[in-house]
Amino acid sequence: VTKQAGKLILTDDNFGTLVHAVDLGRDIYRRISSYVKLQLTILSSVLQLMLIATILNINEGVALFPMQLLFAKFFVVVTVVIGFIVDVPDPGVMERPPRAPGSRIATGAQTVRWIISGFIIAGSALALLAWGPGEPSTTDPSTSMTMAFTVVALSAVNMGFVMRRERQVPWSAPLFPYLGWIMLGWALTLAAVETRLLQRLLDTVSLTGA
């Protein structure tokens, strides 16, 4: 941000240009920080999900089918990432004090939060897989595995919503267009378990009884 601001000030000595450059840099940092935190939380949850399922021999270690993981990662999560990109700048970003030099996204406390959040998601999915309705299968669609997949996918979207603002509630105005992409993530998860095409592709079953 300092280098960018320096280049701008050489050609434009208006103080407002410098302020705008700092504002832009802080907003870019916020988006990158939210993206990194979301991805590492999801990675933590998936790794713990697979590891615990293998250790406890839940459904022979098959917590989710590969296509379910790929759909959650490359379709559902992408909607949240796009939401980060198109979200309006944080209106209060210039009211906060500057970050300390050398501050990092991946601090020790933040790593602990990623692990705990991932464990909660993984534990919820595994509980449904182990004790949910119907016996899970390593080859065929089942209600319990579909519920586990739904927990993972919805948790990814909801975590993205929570991580939208660093020091503000996630529903702080203006909500759109960010909320529109979050809603698309919810809709894709619903479609994955309720439309026949995606049911066949992802080996899911309807959770509404339809």
Report the location of each language-model feature.
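Structural signal for alpha-helical transmembrane segments and their membrane-water exit/capping regions
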Residues: L188-T195
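Alpha-helical transmembrane segments of multi-pass membrane proteins
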Residues: W181-G185
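Membrane-embedded transport module
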Residues: K3-Q168, A192
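Cytoplasmic-side transmembrane-helix entry/capping segments in multi-pass membrane proteins
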Residues: W171-G180
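Generic alpha-helical secondary structure signal
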Residues: G16, A109, P177, R196-Q199
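Membrane-interface helix termini and inter-helical loops of multi-pass transporters
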Residues: P133-T139, L197-L207
